From Swiss-Prot:
Gene for this chain: mnmG
Keywords (A to Z) from UniProt: Cytoplasm, FAD, Flavoprotein, NAD, tRNA processing
Presence of the UniProt keyword tRNA processing in the record: yes
Protein family: Belongs to the MnmG family.
GO cellular-component term (any): cytosol
Needed co-factor(s): FAD
Binding site for FAD: 8-13
Region (Disordered): 199-227
Residue ranges, compositional bias (Basic and acidic residues): 200-218
Localisation per UniProt entry: Cytoplasm
Record protein name field: tRNA uridine 5-carboxymethylaminomethyl modification enzyme MnmG
Organism: Chlorobium luteolum (strain DSM 273 / BCRC 81028 / 2530) (Pelodictyon luteolum)
Function: NAD-binding protein involved in the addition of a carboxymethylaminomethyl (cmnm) group at the wobble position (U34) of certain tRNAs, forming tRNA-cmnm(5)s(2)U34.
UniProt GO molecular function: flavin adenine dinucleotide binding
SMART domains for the chain: GIDA_assoc_3
Length: 621
């Protein structure tokens, strides 16, 4: 018997298995192909808007994704630097093959982890408690808990034009059959979603004189808090071209053979990552769309055509690609395709990712209706932490919306109606100024340390940084900038004359002012600050905390109000039907979702503020 069995070794499964085994428990990771561990089946990249923040949070909690991309990245960029700090998001292109090799090596190094090449086709449970899993080989493996991270494999069906093939992630990988049906028999509700991927081309066939080069940053910050620097790393460029009206006309000639428009695809696709044919259909007035050409690694000629996700017939794909600048002679390596797959609407899970119907069974990743490697990895890590915590009799990790993007992700899953693949955006987080990529360690590392996934040394580095931030803030409070120095600085910004000096903590709030400018203008202040810490991340956080102090205080007040509702627990078998005053829709949604707290209940679609007022009175009794 294993403590925990993990089904699937994608981005969710690898993080789940590592979290369990590093907690000191025995774990079995079952996957159809051990050479496809953490495979990047779509874009060869980690991070991006909101996703970069999630990757940093995974690292702070003790996950592996950030270390993996630091080790195998081929281009690193910080996005949205022209916007405020809440929007700054790290992103990296990955060497796809090297990333898989890194993750497989990480799994193989874990002494508590066994790997098995097989397929989970069913679960065994007795009286609502998980007992084990059934494998395609016919074997029964018993376990105290199981985490299902099946990705797009559940009854996967791939579409290219009017042709369709059973496939789990690519045409070469078989789907998982039987598991969906097994779970439905156990009382779960399943649905159908769709996603897609662009074609891959031979980068030697691109005319680089006709496309725009996009280089990486010279000194990008690492994703992992344990990576000292990425300075001097070899990087590859990406390139930008555009679709044209001619491209769109060519692609339209294939719409009568498109599975999207002929009704062959039944699953609902991601709203914010539409196919090129969907973009043409939805935005007919747009003469063109950005297309990004992204290399897939140092040792391959494959290039990913970002922005050209499609399931049109292969001949139409080739003609469409060759109508764009720089791609006139392009060679196709792999056609783009759409894939339909089963998922389980996530109102059926708790915020710990344990299912409500079967104890000790957890769902993580695309089985919950999410899209994206980072969203999947975050869920896998959380499920692994909580499965281990339950066995070890530790408190479960429940992240609030004000704690982390991961908290927002899980709360949205368990409270909102899932009608399409869920993708995280900064706009999804009402506390996004608090949930920046740079402070993920301060927000979350203590949780990872309590779970046994973050070392004492890493936790001490975080505490040292926190102490330095506090001491530097105190220094800015007691150090004043003389009027003549301040006047000289602000006159360069075209600001009114300064009649008197100011504390540095106040002066830094002025437009165009920065900690670096103030340090360079006041040598004694610079010397005192550097004697506290030379950590540039600590300096950056001090500047952000001081500049946005008023906004951060408002976010904290909002978070406190929400926390009061989240502190009011609702019994799991609460009888909503007998409460007078609740709307009929409210009763229906409360019964199906079974919220854990009044705060969760308030965020369920269809539960009105008046319903919450009625509940508050009854629960308060």
């Amino acid at each position: 018997m294993y403590d925990v069995i993990v089904a699937g070794a994608g981005h969710a499964g690898t993080e789940a298995a590592l979290a369990v085994s590093r907690s000191g428990l025995s774990c079995l990771l079952v996957t159809t192909d051990l050479n496809a561990v953490a495979r990047m089946s779509c874009n060869p990249a980690i991070g991006g808007v909101a996703k970069g923040q999630i990757t940093r949070e995974i690292d702070a909690l003790g996950g592996e994704m950030a270390k993996a991309i630091d080790s195998t990245g081929i281009q690193f960029r910080m996005l949205n630097l022209s916007k405020g700090p809440a929007m700054h998001s790290p992103r990296a292109q990955a060497d796809r093959v090297a990333y898989t090799a890194y993750m497989k090596r990480a799994l193989e190094e874990e002494v508590n982890l066994d790997l098995l090449q097989d397929t989970v086709t069913g679960i065994e449970q007795r009286e609502g408690i998980l007992r084990g899993v059934r494998l395609l080989s016919g074997r029964l493996v018993t376990g105290r808990a199981a985490i299902l991270t099946c990705g797009t494999f559940l009854n996967g069906l791939i579409h290219i034009g009017m042709d369709h093939y059973p496939g789990g992630r690519t045409i070469a990988e078989p789907p998982v059959t039987g598991l969906t049906e097994n779970l439905i028999l156990a009382g779960f509700e399943a649905g159908r979603l769709k996603t897609g991927t662009p074609p891959r081309i031979d980068r030697r066939s691109v005319d680089y004189s006709r496309v725009e080069e996009q280089k990486g940053d010279e000194n990008p910050p690492p994703f992992s808090f344990s990576t000292p620097t990425l300075k001097g790393r070899a990087q590859l460029s990406c390139y930008v071209t555009h679709s044209s009206e001619r491209t769109h006309e060519i692609l339209k000639t294939g719409f009568d053979r498109s599975p999207l428009f002929t009704g062959k695809v039944q699953g609902i696709g991601p709203r914010y990552c539409p196919s090129i044919e969907d973009k043409i259909f939805r935005f007919p007035d747009r003469p063109g769309h950005h297309i990004f050409l992204e290399p897939e690694g140092f040792e391959t000629n494959e290039m990913y055509v970002n922005g050209f996700s499609t399931s049109l017939p292969e001949d139409i794909q080739i003609d469409g690609l060759r109508s764009m600048k720089g791609l006139e002679e392009v060679k196709l390596i792999r056609a783009g395709y759409a894939i339909e797959y089963d998922y389980f609407p996530p109102y059926q899970i708790h915020s710990t990712l344990e299912t409500k119907r079967i104890r000790n069974l957890y769902f993580a990743g695309q089985i919950n209706g999410t899209s994206g490697y980072e969203e999947a990895a975050a869920q896998g890590l959380l499920a692994g932490i909580n499965a281990a915590a339950d066995i070890l009799k530790r408190p479960a990790l429940r992240l609030k919306r004000s704690d982390a993007y991961i908290g927002v992700l899980v709360d949205d899953l368990v409270t909102k109606e899932m009608k399409e693949p869920y993708r995280m955006f900064t706009s999804s987080a009402e506390h996004r100024l608090m949930l920046r990529h740079d402070n993920a360690d301060i927000r979350l590392m203590h949780f990872g340390h309590q779970s046994g996934l973050v070392s004492d040394a890493a936790m001490e580095r975080c505490r040292t940084k926190m102490r330095a931030i506090g001491e530097i803030k105190a220094l800015t409070e007691k150090t004043a900038i003389p009027a003549e120095v301040l006047d000289s600085l602000i006159s360069k910004q075209g600001q009114p004359h300064a009649a008197s000096g100011q504390k540095i903590s106040a002066a830094i709030k002025r437009p165009g002012m920065s900690l670096e400018i103030l340090m360079n203008s006041l040598p004694p202040f610079r010397e005192a600050l550097l004697s506290i810490s030379t950590d540039k991340e600590a300096h950056q956080q001090v500047e952000i905390d001081l500049k946005y102090e008023g906004y951060l205080k408002r976010e904290l007040l909002t978070a406190d109000k929400i926390a009061r509702l989240d502190a009011l627990q609702i019994p799991s078998e609460y009888n909503y039907s007998c409460i007078k005053g609740l709307s009929s829709e409210g009763v229906e949604k409360l019964i199906s979702h079974r919220p854990e707290t009044l705060g969760q209940a308030s965020r369920i679609s269809g539960v009105s503020p008046s319903d919450i007022s009625v509940l508050m009175v009854h629960i308060g009794r």
